[in-house]
């Protein structure tokens, strides 16, 4: 699995086996970001259930200004941090361009961010999807994680 476009194109992403972790394929990310086009430029990304970080890292590689990654599994988040370091180095981005939050997504969404995000990736594990779906969207809206021009992508 690799970054499919932008400054870090071709950089490999590591993965760790964990229940429910199914990284987005390179082909799917490439199609998605091709359809988004320049809308990713200078955006603030929120990558929920980040896993390997492939969505947020793809966005950073393609010109997003910042990505916040939320992953509750500590072991998975360690691999995520390694992936972030590799992409930031390859794309010549500062470490401040990425932030990792090791926390349950629903608990995080009870807070209110300093600023809303322009691009939100929502890719929960399949086994949690039915339990989370309504709560996730409600909290994203209620607690101002999004604004009227935000783009929310749910897989």
Question: What residues fall within each predicted segment?
Answer:
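Class I S-adenosyl-L-methionine-dependent methyltransferase catalytic core
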Residues: 1-155
